[in-house]
């Protein structure tokens, strides 16, 4: 591990109520790309291998702990019962935590989800030889942000937007809030803020900058790799904007790595994607969780894939939903198919339109063309399932299994009442209700006999 990161402690400020979100849950639990805003930050800082990660929260602590995944790292949760500013939030941790004077304290914000690990490493590595380092950014529209004030090129203070003079508001270098401070100096400077509050009776963390400057410290600063990394979320419009930025960035990476997207503005990745070569993804496709796609796969418009493995040369026609499933090579799915609940589709299979497959193994070279439901089933090779076939797997108390062995033909509009076994080579006639096991190569049919009803002619005039 790099020496610069060995003494690293992280504080993530997440106590804001998100009033402008008009919500009943903590702002940092609202989702960006399918996971909580705060989770984006945590997932990145875990790569820094800090000694401790402290999350300062304001309310709904139980809900936060439930929704946030620690990925095996022990997160420390600190309550800021009264939201009295960013300085007050950091005080809740730094005055209670025991550590070495030389510890580096990285301060982040739970509502700034797109900051990159490369930018954080850049900030940490540049901190060597300084007591305090800031992440600043130069942006075209700095309204709402605190301005960086420099004297002779050196940072001397930060002025909040509402306190800035007209001349200061022309400054385009802004404070992102992200900083690294040595523990001794952070504690020392925060002590000086104990009795210093703004007009809203809040303690601003940014006030330590002027204290540091006046005591002879040089305030180090670096810029993010990309400006959008420092954008925060205070309302749902800003959340939507960052969602769009995030999705376009993901799409660019995929395009540059050989994936063809029909329209990168209409692609949605809400998890992770591992992919092979020569993949085509049409518009309005949503990928969730862990998605693994092999070579030469084609995915039609409007499909939703969640926690799936798709092997080589699979074609998925439009508006198919595939969740928690594995598709073997050379299969053709959809349109409007629904495959889910640990189903496994073997090689060279056809699953047609309006077919639902749940918790089922569907064997090699088998076909189910349309309008069928196959649940809790084990289906062999070379099986043909006719239109309208359903497995009746639930008896009111438990799910029961249907087993269809190799080379079976099931006629259209058949009902298979589980538990039932249809042995190899059997033929089930159209419209049959199967209530008991069928022997090998048997041909069975059970349907109401067709008959005519004679109508008397009406001779009345």
Curated annotation (Swiss-Prot):
Quote the Pfam families the UniProt record gives.
Hexapep (PF00132), NTP_transf_3 (PF12804)
Q: Where is this region: Pyrophosphorylase?
A: 1-236
Record-annotated residues binding Mg(2+)?
111, 234
Q: Where does UDP-N-acetyl-alpha-D-glucosamine bind?
A: 27, 80, 85-86, 109-111, 146, 160, 175, 234, 358, 373, 384
Question: Which residues are acetyl-CoA-binding?
Answer: 387, 430, 447
Q: Its Enzyme Commission number?
A: 2.7.7.23, 2.3.1.157
One GO cellular-component annotation of the UniProt record comes to: membrane
UniProt GO molecular function: glucosamine-1-phosphate N-acetyltransferase activity; magnesium ion binding; UDP-N-acetylglucosamine diphosphorylase activity
Its annotated pathway reads: Nucleotide-sugar biosynthesis; UDP-N-acetyl-alpha-D-glucosamine biosynthesis; N-acetyl-alpha-D-glucosamine 1-phosphate from alpha-D-glucosamine 6-phosphate (route II): step 2/2; Nucleotide-sugar biosynthesis; UDP-N-acetyl-alpha-D-glucosamine biosynthesis; UDP-N-acetyl-alpha-D-glucosamine from N-acetyl-alpha-D-glucosamine 1-phosphate: step 1/1; Bacterial outer membrane biogenesis; LPS lipid A biosynthesis
Which residues act catalytically here? 370
Keyword annotations: Acyltransferase, Cell shape, Cell wall biogenesis/degradation, Cytoplasm, Magnesium, Metal-binding, Multifunctional enzyme, Nucleotidyltransferase, Peptidoglycan synthesis, Repeat, Transferase
Requisite cofactors: Mg(2+)
Where does it primarily localize?
Answer: cytoplasm
This protein's assembly is summarised as:
Homotrimer.
**Described function:** Catalyzes the last two sequential reactions in the de novo biosynthetic pathway for UDP-N-acetylglucosamine (UDP-GlcNAc). The C-terminal domain catalyzes the transfer of acetyl group from acetyl coenzyme A to glucosamine-1-phosphate (GlcN-1-P) to produce N-acetylglucosamine-1-phosphate (GlcNAc-1-P), which is converted into UDP-GlcNAc by the transfer of uridine 5-monophosphate (from uridine 5-triphosphate), a reaction catalyzed by the N-terminal domain.
Name under which the protein is recorded: Bifunctional protein GlmU
User: What organism does this protein naturally occur in?
Assistant: Wigglesworthia glossinidia brevipalpis
Designated gene of the protein: glmU
